[in-house]
Amino acid sequence: ITKVLPNENIIYFGDTEHLPYGEKSKEAIQSFSRKIIKFLIEKKCKTIVIACNSASAVADGSVYRVSASTPIYNVIDPVVKEVIKICSDYNIGVIGTKATIGSGIYESKIKSECSTSNVISLATPLLAPMIEEGFINEKISNTVIANYLANPVLKNIDHLILACTHYPLIHKEIDEYYKGGVNVIDSANIVAIHIANELKKENLLNYSTKTEHHFYVSNYTKSFEKCAQFFFQENIKLEEVNLFV
């Protein structure tokens, strides 16, 4: 989003107290999401992105109804919209957390618009914590990735959806594993372009060249700050805010 919309001020909230979301119940994730959205509305955000596939997968009306006027977007619908354009008669693989895969949301949304496609999903729960710990482009990460992708359920796929916002950081390694034989679909750029188009449509784009980003977490740790700096490629400082008293 910061690359596609460089003039926008970003307020990021990472719920580090409850990581990983992929292991939490639907009800717990919905409760956390509602409180975070309320916090972002109080910060006068003009648009809110649920930048997590696990949270997006289980977001229900109670989550979206937190705001009557602020648009709330998930990271699943824009990707599904793009996949539907190319889905006919293809085998589409999906990898993500247990919560995302267990929800079956990608299968149901894609199949509802493209009944001829074959959607195969695989939970890959070790990938997100591996990335958070900084194991990227190393022997360990390559081994873990290869073990998951070699699973027989993913055999003969034509496209692979990276259904976790962490996974773009290992896109290169996944591409290298497939050696061009599979089209790896990175959600990050798709979602960012969708948000940019929506802001433009609503005349909400910011054209100022002076931007200010704020990064909040529910539980500060030095390791997550280091991880966040790796994600954003800048020297950022995290501010702890306890929303869950």
What name fits each language-model region?
Residues 1-245:
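Non-catalytic structural scaffold of enzyme domains
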